[in-house]
A protein has these predicted regions:
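Double-stranded RNA-binding/processing signature
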Residues: 1-77
Protein backbone atom coordinates (compact mmCIF):
# COMPACT_ATOMS: atom_id res chain seq x y z
CA UNK A 1 0.00 0.00 0.00
CA UNK A 2 1.19 3.51 -0.72
CA UNK A 3 1.47 6.15 1.95
CA UNK A 4 -0.75 9.20 1.57
CA UNK A 5 1.07 12.19 0.13
CA UNK A 6 1.80 14.90 2.68
CA UNK A 7 1.28 18.35 1.23
CA UNK A 8 4.23 20.75 1.09
CA UNK A 9 2.88 23.13 3.73
CA UNK A 10 2.46 20.30 6.25
CA UNK A 11 5.87 18.85 5.43
CA UNK A 12 7.57 22.24 5.89
CA UNK A 13 5.69 22.80 9.16
CA UNK A 14 6.85 19.42 10.52
CA UNK A 15 10.44 20.12 9.47
CA UNK A 16 10.46 23.61 10.99
CA UNK A 17 8.90 22.47 14.27
CA UNK A 18 11.32 19.55 14.59
CA UNK A 19 14.44 21.56 13.76
CA UNK A 20 13.65 25.04 15.14
CA UNK A 21 10.61 24.55 17.42
CA UNK A 22 8.94 27.26 15.32
CA UNK A 23 6.25 27.39 12.67
CA UNK A 24 7.07 28.73 9.20
CA UNK A 25 6.06 32.37 8.75
CA UNK A 26 3.81 33.07 5.75
CA UNK A 27 3.29 36.64 4.58
CA UNK A 28 0.61 37.42 2.02
CA UNK A 29 1.61 40.52 0.14
CA UNK A 30 0.05 40.84 -3.26
CA UNK A 31 -3.07 40.09 -5.28
CA UNK A 32 -2.87 40.73 -9.00
CA UNK A 33 -4.76 39.92 -12.16
CA UNK A 34 -8.37 40.41 -13.18
CA UNK A 35 -11.19 40.08 -10.64
CA UNK A 36 -12.40 36.80 -12.18
CA UNK A 37 -8.90 35.24 -12.22
CA UNK A 38 -6.81 36.71 -9.41
CA UNK A 39 -3.28 35.59 -8.61
CA UNK A 40 -1.93 35.69 -5.08
CA UNK A 41 1.67 36.14 -4.00
CA UNK A 42 2.89 34.86 -0.63
CA UNK A 43 6.28 34.35 0.89
CA UNK A 44 7.43 31.85 3.49
CA UNK A 45 10.40 31.84 5.82
CA UNK A 46 11.87 29.58 8.47
CA UNK A 47 14.92 30.34 10.65
CA UNK A 48 18.34 30.16 8.95
CA UNK A 49 16.89 30.08 5.45
CA UNK A 50 16.13 32.40 2.59
CA UNK A 51 12.63 33.64 1.89
CA UNK A 52 10.77 31.84 -0.89
CA UNK A 53 7.88 33.31 -2.87
CA UNK A 54 4.88 31.34 -4.06
CA UNK A 55 2.26 32.40 -6.58
CA UNK A 56 -1.13 30.75 -6.92
CA UNK A 57 -4.80 31.10 -7.76
CA UNK A 58 -5.67 31.32 -4.04
CA UNK A 59 -3.81 32.29 -0.87
CA UNK A 60 -3.69 28.61 0.14
CA UNK A 61 -2.35 27.60 -3.28
CA UNK A 62 0.30 30.33 -3.10
CA UNK A 63 1.36 29.13 0.37
CA UNK A 64 1.66 25.54 -0.90
CA UNK A 65 3.80 26.71 -3.82
CA UNK A 66 6.04 28.79 -1.53
CA UNK A 67 6.44 25.84 0.86
CA UNK A 68 7.26 23.47 -2.02
CA UNK A 69 9.94 25.87 -3.32
CA UNK A 70 11.51 26.14 0.14
CA UNK A 71 11.47 22.36 0.62
CA UNK A 72 13.07 22.00 -2.80
CA UNK A 73 15.72 24.61 -1.90
CA UNK A 74 16.46 22.73 1.35
CA UNK A 75 16.53 19.39 -0.52
CA UNK A 76 13.75 17.95 1.64
CA UNK A 77 11.30 16.89 -1.11
Amino acid sequence: STLPQIDSKTKLQEYSLKKYKELPKYTFYKKTGPQHRPMFKTDVQIPDSKIMIGIGTSKKNAQQNAARKLLDFLNIL
